[in-house]
């Protein structure tokens, strides 16, 4: 069989084996030519993988007119479609406003947007902000975690329900789908659902462990945008791994390897 470029370069400490097969499967998918290999190379610092750029998304000046200069720069940087980008800022600096403006202009260009966060509440907050632009916005997840969502957001408990709805209804090109990180791994990585985003917006990235990098890469986004606050509560790790050098958030790791991007 073909030898992986990646699997022999990782050292695994397995204390929670339930996800092991999933992560190995994700790396193998990427190794076989799937979108995301650049991301794995960047995270693991395996090669000098340069950030690539796709055809830019057109900027709508009206959408960003209410943003300050730094926020507008972040939006415009992402509209240039880099393969990897990170936005850092403490609470109250308008990170969600930037996220929603990016989602608006991507969907206006007919491109799918995936929003993932560590918690349902963070997903709901992001989707509520995005839905103010009156664009197709969908939340997938536990129905008991949708109480705080705006009424115009379409809600599904499972990806199967969403897929069935799309088959029965003519959906516009370019929509926003939001779910938790665990939901994205189960629905889009493990089950290989057909939803393919042009961009993946990862909020609360400072709470996501670095080990989830391989699964996030397998979400097949052309652009990955990590949004976080380096002063926010870090991920919680198994007590036997608290001193491990890899027991950090994916956002903290990005700050170390790509300081010029933050």
Residue ranges and their predicted role:
Residues 1-76, 128, 132, 140, ...:
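Pre-ATPase regulatory/linker segments immediately N-terminal to the P-loop/RecA-like helicase/translocase core
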Residues 63-83, 97-98, 179-181:
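N-terminal pre-P-loop "Q-motif" helix
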Residues 71-74, 87, 94-106, 122-126, ...:
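Extended, hydrophobic alpha-helical segments in both membrane/secreted and soluble proteins
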Residues 91-93, 98-130, 138-141, 262:
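Conserved RecA-like ASCE P-loop NTPase motor core of nucleic-acid helicases/translocases
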Residues 108-111, 118-119, 182-186, 193-262:
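Conserved helicase motor core of SF1/SF2 NTP-dependent helicases
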Residues 111-112, 135-139, 145, 196-198:
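Residues that mark the start of a beta-strand
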Residues 123-125, 146-151, 233-237:
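Switch/connector loops and helix/strand junctions flanking conserved nucleotide-binding motifs
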Residues 149-177:
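Conserved motor-coupling elements within RecA-like helicase/translocase cores
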């Amino acid at each position: 069989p073909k030898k992986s470029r990646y699997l022999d370069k990782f050292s695994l400490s397995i204390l929670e084996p339930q996800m092991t097969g999933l992560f190995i499967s994700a790396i193998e998918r990427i190794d076989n030519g799937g979108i995301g290999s650049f991301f794995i190379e960047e995270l693991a610092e395996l090669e000098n993988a340069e950030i690539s750029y796709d055809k830019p998304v057109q900027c709508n000046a009206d959408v960003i007119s209410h943003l300050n200069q730094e926020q507008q720069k972040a939006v415009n940087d992402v509209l240039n479609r880099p393969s990897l980008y990170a936005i850092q800022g403490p609470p109250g600096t308008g990170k969600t406003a930037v996220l929603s403006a990016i989602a608006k202009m991507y969907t206006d260009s007919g491109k799918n947007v995936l929003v993932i966060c560590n918690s349902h509440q963070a997903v709901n907050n992001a989707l509520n902000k995005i839905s103010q632009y009156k664009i197709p916005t969908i939340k997938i997840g536990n129905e008991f975690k949708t109480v705080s969502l705006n009424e115009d957001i379409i809600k599904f408990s499972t990806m199967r329900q969403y897929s069935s709805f799309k088959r029965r209804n003519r959906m516009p090109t370019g929509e926003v789908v939001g779910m938790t990180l665990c939901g994205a791994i189960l629905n889009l990585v493990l089950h290989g659902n057909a939803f393919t985003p042009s961009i993946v917006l990862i909020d609360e990235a400072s709470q996501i462990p670095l080990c989830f990098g391989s699964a996030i890469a397998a979400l097949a986004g052309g652009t990955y945008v990590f949004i976080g606050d380096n002063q926010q509560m870090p991920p919680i790790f198994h007590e036997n791994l608290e001193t491990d050098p890899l027991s950090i958030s994916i956002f903290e790791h990005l700050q170390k390897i790509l300081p010029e991007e933050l």
